[in-house]
Amino acid sequence: GPRRRSNGGAADGDVMKRMLINATQPEERRLAIVDGQKLVDFETEIEGREQRKGNIYKAVVTRVEPSLEACFVDYGEDRHGFLPFKEISKNYFREGVEAKNARIQDAIKEGDTLLVQVEKEERGNKGAALTTYVSLAGRYLVLMPNNPRGGGVSRRIEGEDREELKDAMDQLEYPKGMSLIARTAGIGRSAPELQWDLNYLLKLWDAIDGAAKAGKGAFLIYQESSLVIRAIRDYFNADIGEILIDTDDIFDQAKQFMTHVMPETAPRVKRYRDDAPLFSRFQIEHQIETAFSRTVNLPSGGAIVIDHTEALVSIDVNSARATRGTDIEETASRTNLEAADEIARQCRLRDLGGLIVVDFIDMDESKNRREVEMRLRDALRSDRARVQFSSISKFGLLELSRQRLRPALSEGSHITCPRCNGTGHIRDTESSALQILRMVQEESMKENTAAVHVQVPVEV
């Protein structure tokens, strides 16, 4: 692709952060966050593979099964869903049924209508598992509108972060009978910021509740996993200057959602109508390509090489060929600093999860090592995933662990190579020939072998 200008900006000195949504190919929707013309985050959703998990439906009970302590419900999809009795809020029980010792056959009857949320996707011949205890994920909080006893702080938040969040949450205002969970993205957020998120969730719940009461029969009320809505919820913040969308239907969806939850920033949602394709206009197609390639080049000539193994992801940092008279320590340190930025970016683009080990170029001076550690920390600050670090060890390795946010990019679009089974190597000609001769020998020794036929490549 074309060389990126070193300042990463467009010709007009454009440094605005933007969210770009490309949906011109009906089979795939792509989301990119760009800073000027530098791609900083990327996500894709393939038609027919959307998740239903988190979706909310109006459902009708079709069969009550006392032996399973559950009922089956029609929720508007092909197969009926499975709703265990313990997942049914007592607000849905028939009049006069004691909530304490109730049996499902007394509390629920065929034809009852309920509001349900998908907990587990359907798999194979099993229907989806449902619950009536809805949870709505916001950016910093999860609201449980009909579950008074579900609240707290995400288990992954520890120490003083936990205390601070609890204090902030005690200041929030919301109706009785609801509860809240703080998400990890809420760490370090003030009570007003949390309240802003909560107000959006309360509005959303009102809208869902209203739609459920208004409509008849079984139907989808709220689609959790529409890429657009998730993107605005999880990525949008004040420093994103505009959201550009290149198809009408997705634009309408985003506009409607924004007007509903953040009317003051709704004008930032814009319909992109230029002749040049949206992603080409911001020169990010070739940057997306780097998210699929093993080697990623750095600005001053070095590169990083990313390999997946069973146990971990390894990232090797290589410097450019050293020219005479250059200071080796300085080259090493500069390459490592560039690598730190690129590694943080690739973690996000590829959504690398689990254990990641980086082999930096060896540096003698400890202040340079600290500087590289700090640079990586800063670069990962804007990551939505939770990341933990070690420092650079005496062998020049740095370990980090990163939470997985979604199925990895490569899982969605790549398969293991059927020839090498993912090792990247197959036997060379000589080795193959010898192995085949051994097999021929072994087969021909057997009593009942009349002839041995071997299919081999020409060279072998």
Name each region found by the language model.
Residues S67-C71, Y75, R79-H80, E121-P145, ...:
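Conserved glycine-centered short motifs in functionally critical loops
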Residues G111-T113, K216-G217, R268, L312, ...:
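Loop/turn-to-beta-strand initiation segments
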Residues G150-S154, G177-R183, D209-L220, I240-D246, ...:
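Interdomain boundary/hinge elements
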